[in-house]
Swiss-Prot record:
Cellular component terms per the entry's GO annotation: cell surface; extracellular region; plasma membrane
Segments of skewed composition (Low complexity): 183-196
Biased composition (Polar residues): 337-346
Disulfide bond residue pairs: none
Protein name (record): Probable glucan 1,3-beta-glucosidase D
Organism annotation: Aspergillus fumigatus (strain CBS 144.89 / FGSC A1163 / CEA10)
Length: 833
C-alpha cells in the first residue's frame, strides 16, 4: 500500500532524528507532517504530541512557539528609527520618560553654565530665559518700563551716531593731510571714498529700518497685552518655561508619517516651528513676522528654506533614478508579462451629488465617495442588508449564462462534480493578507518592529490602515485577473476572506467590512467569466491555527484557551450571517462550494471539539439555505484517519486536503525526477483511495498545492525566517535539506528566486512537469485549486506568472504530461536548485 504523501519514514531516519530540534514557528507550517504509514490505525485517543503523523518538528504553540514580535511598544520602536536623526546622539533603544526628563535637565543646566555658547541664545540669561521676558515675568510694570526702555534705546542710538560721525571726521582729516605719516600707497581715491560712504549710509539706513520694525512690533505686542489684560497673563508661560518646553517629547506617529507630513516633523524638531505652527500663529495674529525674539534679522525658517530646498533637490536627483530602477526590477520579477493599473476609477460618480447619501451614512463604508475605487460598483445608496450584511454596491440583476470554456457547462447548468474534475486557483494574499504573497506591505519595517501578520500590520498602520489596505484590495486583483483565469483554462476560484469582512470584536485592529465589498465584486467578475466560486474563511475569531495567514500569529484562541468557547460562538455567528447572505437566489449557481474554516490545527486542538463544531456549523448553514457543497479541512491528520471520521455527517460535504512537498524535510530533499515519481505513485493512489466512499472518506478536493520545489520564497516560512533549503530555517541546526546537501555543491536559493527571464529551458520543463503531475494526481479525486493565482515576487507560487512565462500548460485542461507517461529528461539541470 502506498505511503502517505506527508510521510517521512520511507526516506530514512534522519528526519525523525532531527524532529525534536525543529521549531514549528513558520508561516505555512500547515504542510509538513510525520504521518503514519498504517492506513488502518484509526485510534484517536493517543496523546497528540506522541503521534507518528505529527508535522515535521511540530511543538504545541503554548510550549515552544515564539510569537515573533516583542511585547514592547512596536510603534515606539519604529518612531525611534524614523526620527533617529532628530534625537540626541546615543543608543537607539526606546527611552523612558525619566530618561527624557534627565536629558532635558542636562540641557537646561548647560544653558545656565554658558548662556553665550550658541549665537542663537545670546539674548538669554543663565537660566535659559529670554532676558527681556525674564525681567517682564519677574513683575515689571510693562507700560512704564517699556517707555523707559524705548527712551534708553533712543539715547543709546544718539550716542552711537555721535561716535560714528567723530570717526568719519577723523578718517577724513587723515586722508586730507599731506603728512608723510598719513600717506601710503593704499590711500583711497575720492571716488572710492564716496562709494564707501554711500555704502555705509545704506547699511545705517537698513539698521534703522530694522530697529524701527522692532519698535513697531514691540508696540503692537504691548497694545495686545493691554487689551487682553489679566486673562493673557494667566495663560502666560511660567518663568523660565516656553511653549516649546510643554510640548510632548514624541511628536511622531505611524499615522502622522502615513499622511506624508514627516518633512514637517523634521522642521518641528521637538514641538516648535514648522509650517503648521507658523500658519496657526499668523491666523491668530500673534506672530510678528519673525521667530527671532529680538525682532531683527532674517527669520530662522526663511534662512533654512533655501538650504532645505537645495537638499531636497539633491535627494530627488538620487532617489528618483533609484526608485525607477527598483520599480522596474520589481515589476519584471513579479510578473514581467503584465502590470496592474493603480489608478482608481470613480467615473460612475460623475454627475451624482454627495447629498444623495444620507447624512448618517456619509463618511462610512456605505459612502461611495470614501471608496478608493468605484469601478463596476452600483453607487446608488441603499442600507439594505441580508443576514445583517450590506448589499451596497450590487446591481439588482445578474446573468448566469457564461461558461469559461467549452468543456464546462454554463453557470445556470449544474457542474458534474464527481465525473469532471475541478481546475481552479486561489486568490491568496488578497483579502486575507499573507506576507510572502505581498511582501511590499511588510518590507518597510525593521526586523525588530514585530510587523509579521495582518493584526500587527493593521495595528501599526493605525488610522491609515483602511486606505492602505483598500488600495491593495482595489489593485492587487482586478477584473483582468478573472479574464486571465478563464483564458488559462481554469473553471473555479477559491476566494479567501476573513471574519473582519463581516464583523470585528473587542480590540481588533483589523479593517472592518471594506473587504466584503471587494469579495462581492469578485464574485460578480467570476459570474461574468463563467467561473464558479469556493468561499474560504481563512481567518476566524481567535485564530484556528496560530499562523500568520489566519490574521494573527501566535496562540490558537478558537476552541482553545480562555476565550475558546467565546470564539467558537463568534465563528458560528459569522457563518450564520454569511450563509444567509449567500443563500440568496443570485448565488445559487455560482457559489458552489462553501468552506467552513481553513486549516484548523487538529494536531493541537481537540479533534472531538473540531468535529462537533463542524457538524453544528454545517447544519446551521444548510438550515439557512446553503445548497452548495460544504468543505471541511483535514486538519493535517493522516488521511487514512478520516476513513472512520464523520461517518454520520450531513449531506453534500467535501474533504479538503492541502499537499506540499517542500515543508516536509523527507520530501524536499528528493531530486527532480524522484519528486515527480513521488507524486505519480504515492500521491496519485492516496487521493484516489480517500476519494472513494467505500475505501476512504468520500469526495475529496486538494484545495492548495504548488509547483515550488524549494522553500526559498521570501517570508514563506515567516517574516525574518530562513529556509530549510539553505539550512537557515532552524535556530539550532544548519543542516541543508536539498538533494546535494551531502555531496555538494551547497544548495542555493539564488536560482529559484531569480527573475523568471533567467530560468533555463530545462528548469521550466521540470517545473511544468512537476505541476502537471500534481494536476493528474488530484484529478483522481474531485480536482484541485492551485496556491495561488498571483504573488508580487514569488514566481513559483504564482500560476499567473508561470502561465505567462511558459512553465504552466497553456490550458489547464490540456497538460502535456500525465501520470503514467514516461518522466522526461531534464537535461543538465543541476540538483542544487
Amino acid at each position: 500500500m502506498p505511503t502517505h504523501s506527508r510521510s517521512r519514514d520511507r526516506y530514512g531516519g534522519r528526519d525523525s532524528d532531527r524532529e525534536a530540534r525543529y521549531d514549528y514557528d513558520y508561516a505555512r507550517r500547515r504542510y509538513a507532517t510525520d504521518d503514519d504509514d498504517d492506513y488502518d490505525d484509526d485510534e484517536l485517543e493517543h496523546d497528540l504530541t506522541e503521534r507518528r503523523y505529527r508535522r515535521d518538528g511540530y511543538r504545541p504553540p503554548r510550549e515552544s512557539r515564539a510569537r515573533g514580535y516583542y511585547e514592547r511598544d512596536a510603534e515606539g520602536a519604529a518612531d525611534e528609527e524614523l526620527l533617529g536623526n532628530e534625537r540626541d546622539p546615543g543608543p537607539r533603544a526606546s527611552r523612558s520618560y525619566g530618561d527624557d526628563y534627565d536629558a532635558r535637565r542636562r540641557e537646561h543646566s548647560r544653558a545656565r553654565e554658558a548662556p553665550r555658547r550658541s549665537e542663537r541664545h545670546r539674548d538669554r540669561d543663565r537660566e535659559g530665559r529670554s532676558r527681556r521676558r525674564a525681567y517682564e515675568d519677574d513683575g515689571r510694570h510693562r507700560t512704564r518700563d517699556g517707555r523707559r526702555d524705548r527712551g534708553r534705546e533712543s539715547d543709546g542710538e544718539a550716542r552711537r551716531s555721535r561716535r560714528r560721525e567723530a570717526g568719519r571726521e577723523t578718517a577724513a582729516r587723515k586722508h586730507r593731510s599731506s603728512d608723510s605719516t598719513n600717506s601710503a600707497s593704499h590711500l583711497l581715491s575720492a571716488d572710492a571714498l564716496a562709494k564707501l560712504g554711500a555704502q555705509y549710509e545704506k547699511e545705517e539706513r537698513r539698521k534703522r529700518e530694522i530697529a524701527k520694525d522692532a519698535a513697531k512690533a514691540e508696540r503692537k505686542r504691548q497694545k495686545k497685552l493691554a487689551v487682553v489684560g489679566e486673562e493673557t497673563r494667566a495663560l502666560r508661560d511660567p518663568p523660565g518655561e516656553s511653549h516649546r518646553d510643554r510640548t510632548k517629547a514624541r511628536v511622531a506617529s505611524g499615522a502622522y508619517l502615513e499622511e506624508g507630513r514627516s518633512p514637517e516633523m523634521r522642521v518641528r524638531h521637538r514641538g516648535g516651528g514648522g509650517p503648521a505652527m507658523e500658519a496657526r500663529w499668523r491666523k491668530e495674529g500673534s506672530w510678528g513676522g519673525t521667530m527671532d525674539d529680538s525682532g531683527g534679522g532674517r527669520p530662522f525658517w526663511k534662512r533654512k528654506r533655501w538650504i532645505g530646498l537645495g537638499a531636497l533637490i539633491i535627494i530627488l536627483v538620487i532617489v528618483i533614478p533609484v526608485a525607477v530602477v527598483v520599480s522596474k526590477k520589481h515589476d519584471n520579477k513579479s510578473d514581467p508579462a503584465d502590470s496592474q493599473g493603480t489608478s482608481p476609477g470613480k467615473s460612475n460618480l460623475d454627475g451624482l451629488s454627495h447629498d444623495s447619501i444620507p447624512a448618517y451614512a456619509q463618511g462610512t463604508y456605505l459612502d461611495p465617495w470614501t471608496w478608493y475605487d468605484t469601478t463596476d460598483f452600483n453607487v446608488t445608496f441603499t442600507n439594505e442588508t441580508v443576514g445583517g450584511l450590506s448589499i451596497m454596491g450590487l446591481n439588482s440583476t445578474w446573468d448566469d449564462s457564461a461558461r469559461p470554456n467549452d468543456n464546462v457547462p454554463p453557470l445556470n447548468e449544474p457542474f458534474p462534480y464527481g465525473s469532471q474534475p475541478i481546475r481552479g486557483v486561489n486568490l491568496g494574499g488578497w483579502l486575507s493578507i499573507e506576507p510572502f504573497i505581498v511582501p511590499s506591505l511588510f518590507d518597510s519595517y525593521s526586523s525588530v518592529s514585530g510587523i509579521i501578520d495582518e493584526w500587527t500590520l493593521s495595528k501599526r498602520l493605525g488610522s491609515s490602515a483602511a486606505s492602505t489596505l483598500e488600495k491593495h484590495y482595489a489593485t492587487f486583483i482586478t477584473e483582468q485577473d478573472f479574464a486571465d483565469i478563464r483564458d488559462a483554462g481554469l473553471d473555479h476560484v477559491r476566494i479567501q476572506y476573513s471574519y473582519w469582512a463581516v464583523a470585528t470584536y473587542d480590540d481588533d485592529p483589523y479593517v472592518a467590512k471594506i473587504s466584503w465589498r471587494y469579495l462581492l465584486r469578485a464574485i460578480e467578475y467570476c459570474r461574468k467569466y463563467g467561473l464558479r466560486v469556493n468561499l474560504d474563511p481563512h481567518g476566524i475569531p481567535g485564530s484556528q491555527n496560530g499562523w500568520n495567514h489566519s490574521g494573527r500569529e501566535g496562540v490558537i484562541g478558537w476552541l482553545n484557551g480562555t476565550d475558546g468557547e467565546l470564539n467558537r460562538n463568534r465563528s458560528l455567528a459569522v457563518h450564520d450571517s454569511v450563509s444567509k447572505f449567500f443563500a440568496q437566489d443570485r448565488y445559487k449557481n455560482i457559489v458552489t462550494i462553501y468552506g467552513l474554516v481553513n486549516e484548523p490545527l487538529m494536531l493541537s486542538l481537540s479533534i472531538e471539539d473540531v468535529l462537533d463544531w463542524t457538524t453544528e456549523a454545517t447544519k446551521l448553514v444548510q438550515k439557512n439555505g446553503i445548497t452548495a457543497y460544504v468543505a471541511l479541512h483535514d486538519g493535517f491528520l493522516n488521511l487514512s484517519k478520516w476513513k472512520s471520521m464523520l461517518k454520520n455527517r450531513p449531506d453534500k460535504m467535501l474533504l479538503d486536503t492541502h499537499q506540499y512537498t517542500i515543508f516536509n524535510t523527507g520530501q524536499i530533499g528528493l531530486n527532480h525526477t524522484a519528486k515527480v515519481n513521488l507524486i505519480c505513485n504515492d500521491w496519485y493512489n492516496m487521493i484516489k483511495e480517500i476519494n472513494s466512499t467505500s475505501t476512504g472518506w468520500g469526495p475529496t478536493i486538494c484545495g492548495e498545492w504548488s509547483q515550488a520545489d524549494t522553500d526559498c520564497a521570501k517570508y514563506l516560512n515567516n517574516v525574518g525566517r530562513g529556509t530549510r533549503w539553505e539550512g537557515t530555517f532552524s535556530l539550532t541546526d544548519s543542516t541543508q535539506y536539498c538533494p546535494t546537501a551531502d555531496t555538494g555543491p551547497p544548495c542555493s536559493c539564488a536560482n529559484a528566486n531569480a527573475d523568471v527571464s533567467k530560468y533555463s529551458a530545462d528548469y521550466k520543463k521540470f517545473l511544468q512537469t512537476y505541476a502537471e503531475a500534481q494536476m493528474s494526481a488530484f484529478e483522481t479525486g474531485q480536482g484541485w485549486f492551485y496556491w495561488t493565482w498571483r504573488t508580487e515576487s514569488a514566481a513559483q507560487w504564482s500560476y499567473r506568472t508561470a502561465w505567462k512565462n511558459g512553465f504552466m500548460p497553456a490550458k489547464a485542461y490540456a497538460p502535456s504530461f500525465r501520470c503514467g507517461d514516461a518522466v522526461p529528461d531534464f537535461g543538465d539541470l543541476p540538483e542544487y536548485y
